[in-house]
Amino acid sequence: MKDLRFRPAAAEDFTFLATMLGESAVWRPDKRTPTGDEVLADARYAMYLAGWPRQGDYGLVAEQDGPVGAAWYRTFTETSHGHGFVTTDVPELAIAVIASRRHEGIGRRLLADLIEASIAQGYPAISLSVAGDNPARRLYESSGFVPVEQHGTSLTMIRHAARST
């Protein structure tokens, strides 16, 4: 990962984060990945970035000759929340790496750094939603995430802060 760097996500990264949200929402190679604009027009996904960055939001962007991946988390309310919602004090994360750069360890590093940040910020856990057949599920499980609920073909997974990476 020569010359690969990781930096905090900023307001200026909004468009790239929207693109990454599309990558995470439709990860199957045989399906068309929605554009950032399409993702933001879909209420199911727009909530992951609405008003970015809000108080408590945290994210990272991986860069090597331009952005290649991103991961971020935010908390939600009982009445307005994402697919991997657990409780109001557990942020839900979103993560994606551009297709041409997958399987290089970028996602693992983004995930590890985001977990570390959530612990440093005092969160008791971090959650996510993943399709049961998504290969990224293995990354999440190897990073300490465990399934807590199933919704159709998707799993809500949680990783408690006490577990070391």
Label every model-predicted segment.
Residues 1-12, 24, 163-165:
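Conserved N-terminal entry element of GNAT/NAT acetyltransferase domains
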Residues 17:
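Hydrophobic pocket/interface hotspot
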Residues 34-59, 64:
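Active-site rim helix/loop that mediates acceptor-substrate recognition in acyltransferases
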Residues 56-61, 70, 94, 154-156:
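Short hydrophobic/aromatic beta-strand element in the GNAT-like acyltransferase core
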Residues 63-64, 68-95:
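Conserved acyl-donor/pantetheine-binding loop and adjacent beta-alpha core of acyl/acetyltransferases
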Residues 87-91, 124-137, 141-165:
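C-terminal "cap" of GNAT-fold acetyltransferases
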Residues 92-103, 130:
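A short, internal acetyl-CoA/4′-phosphopantetheine-binding micro-motif in the GNAT/acyltransferase core
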Residues 94, 103-120, 141-142:
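Conserved acetyl-CoA-binding loop-helix of GNAT-fold acetyltransferases
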